[in-house]
């Protein structure tokens, strides 16, 4: 009977019907779709029915071929088949599906959940010497501080800092501000001689043992240098006094150029109330440019009631 069907298929020109493969042979057994562990497999589709027979052919021809390569070739060949050539395998897959439903009515497809892999480990941070620490750039140092530390380090060793460090720091800050904004008159009053002397002392090293050692190592200054320093200090003090006097004269000249106030402005009424006077002794009503005649009349009038009886309401 099988031979007759094969001959009829050859006459029709279609592919030969699938022979009794392992699927049909296993379907005759009672546990044909069960694994030894008790898991029920899904029924095969048309491609799986066709690929079983074709896979055996390929394995016979190329026994060393990898399973992944065999599956790739089978997929390409299945896509090249026409729909008429797939009909016998589709029918066989439908028969197996109905048999599977009859043998395992309570079967429900439960796909295996993919196990979530371990969370990605955090990227290890490089050591501080070669990692982010190298990207940090040191801030700009003020001129004078770095030199003082560099010069005082080898001479003083581990000696304590002098007590007048705060004063030296203030002088250095004033010097830096003078360099950045030379247009400010106030910052030009820095004693240049004192600052120069402080820098010279810092260059020699801190007080204590380091200073004594430095003084012993260096030659004693001559007597001619002391008068020169005193002359520099005196010249700097005279320049500061001249600048102070000049700034005072400018302020007095500015006040002298102000226009005189009108004679009609009378603020005697405001003087009677001490609460209206600001703590600095001046009043915002003393600027005549912003007072009109109407405002002057209002200010000159008596604001307070003449007696307490005016504050009592009678019905």
From Swiss-Prot:
Domain of life: Eukaryota
Stretches the record annotates as Required for transcriptional activation activity and synergistic coactivation of transcriptional activity with POU3F2: 283-315
Name of the featured protein: Transcription factor SOX-12
Compositional bias annotation for Basic and acidic residues: 100-109, 174-187
Any one annotated GO CC term: protein-DNA complex
Biased composition range(s): Low complexity: 192-221
Start-end of DNA-binding region: 40-108
Keywords: Activator, DNA-binding, Nucleus, Transcription, Transcription regulation
Originating organism: Homo sapiens (Human)
InterPro entries in the cross-refs: HMG_box_dom, HMG_box_dom_sf, SOX-12/11/4, SRY-related_HMG-box_TF-like
Primary location recorded for the protein, binned into one broad class: nucleus
One family name in Pfam for this protein: HMG_box
Gene3D superfamilies in UniProt: High mobility group box domain
Tissue specificity as recorded in UniProt: Expressed most abundantly in the CNS. Expressed in the heart, pancreas, thymus, testis and ovary. Weakly expressed in brain, placenta, lung, liver, skeletal muscle, kidney, spleen, prostate, small intestine, colon, and peripheral blood lymphocytes.
Entry-linked PANTHER family: SOX TRANSCRIPTION FACTOR (PTHR10270), TRANSCRIPTION FACTOR SOX-12 (PTHR10270:SF221)
Region (Disordered): 1-40, 100-288
Function (record text): Transcription factor that binds to DNA at the consensus sequence 5'-ACCAAAG-3'. Acts as a transcriptional activator. Binds cooperatively with POU3F2/BRN2 or POU3F1/OCT6 to gene promoters, which enhances transcriptional activation. Involved in the differentiation of naive CD4-positive T-cells into peripherally induced regulatory T (pT reg) cells under inflammatory conditions. Binds to the promoter region of the FOXP3 gene and promotes its transcription, and might thereby contribute to pT reg cell differentiation in the spleen and lymph nodes during inflammation.
SUPFAM superfamilies hit by this protein: HMG-box (SSF47095)
Biased composition annotated in UniProt, kind: Acidic residues: 162-173, 222-244
Composition-biased stretches (Gly residues): 149-159
Entry's Gene Ontology molecular function annotations: DNA binding; DNA-binding transcription activator activity, RNA polymerase II-specific; DNA-binding transcription factor activity, RNA polymerase II-specific; RNA polymerase II cis-regulatory region sequence-specific DNA binding; sequence-specific double-stranded DNA binding; transcription cis-regulatory region binding
GO biological process: brain development; camera-type eye morphogenesis; negative regulation of transcription by RNA polymerase II; neuron differentiation; positive regulation of regulatory T cell differentiation; positive regulation of transcription by RNA polymerase II; spinal cord development
Subcellular location as annotated: Nucleus
């Amino acid at each position: 009977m099988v031979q007759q069907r094969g001959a009829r298929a050859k006459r029709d020109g279609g592919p030969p019907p699938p022979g009794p493969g392992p699927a049909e042979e296993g379907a005759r057994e009672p546990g044909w779709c069960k694994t030894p562990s008790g898991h029920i497999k899904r029924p095969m589709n048309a491609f799986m029915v066709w690929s079983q027979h074709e896979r055996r052919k390929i394995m016979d021809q190329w026994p060393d071929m990898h399973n992944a390569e065999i599956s790739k070739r089978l997929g390409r060949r299945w896509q090249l088949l026409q729909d008429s050539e797939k009909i016998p395998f589709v029918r066989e897959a439908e028969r197996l599906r109905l048999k599977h439903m009859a043998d395992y009515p309570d079967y429900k497809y439960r796909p295996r959940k993919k196990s979530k892999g371990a969370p990605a480990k955090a990227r290890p941070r490089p050591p501080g010497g070669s990692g982010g620490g190298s990207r940090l750039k040191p801030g700009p140092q003020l001129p004078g501080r770095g030199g003082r530390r560099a010069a005082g380090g080898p001479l003083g060793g581990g000696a304590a800092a002098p007590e007048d460090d705060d004063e030296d720091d203030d002088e250095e800050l004033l010097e830096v501000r003078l360099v950045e904004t030379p247009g400010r008159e106030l910052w030009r009053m820095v004693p240049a001689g004192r600052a120069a002397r402080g820098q010279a002392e810092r260059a020699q090293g801190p007080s204590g043992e380091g200073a004594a050692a430095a003084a012993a190592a260096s030659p004693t200054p001559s007597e001619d240098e002391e008068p020169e320093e005193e002359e520099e200090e005196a010249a700097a003090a005279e320049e500061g006094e001249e600048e102070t006097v000049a700034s005072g004269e400018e302020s007095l000249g500015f006040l002298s150029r102000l226009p005189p106030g009108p004679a009609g402005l009378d603020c005697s009424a405001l003087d009677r109330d001490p609460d209206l006077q600001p703590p600095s002794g001046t009043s915002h009503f003393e600027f005549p440019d912003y007072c009109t005649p109407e405002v002057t009349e209002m200010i000159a009038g008596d604001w307070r009631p003449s007696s307490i009886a005016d504050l009592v309401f009678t019905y």
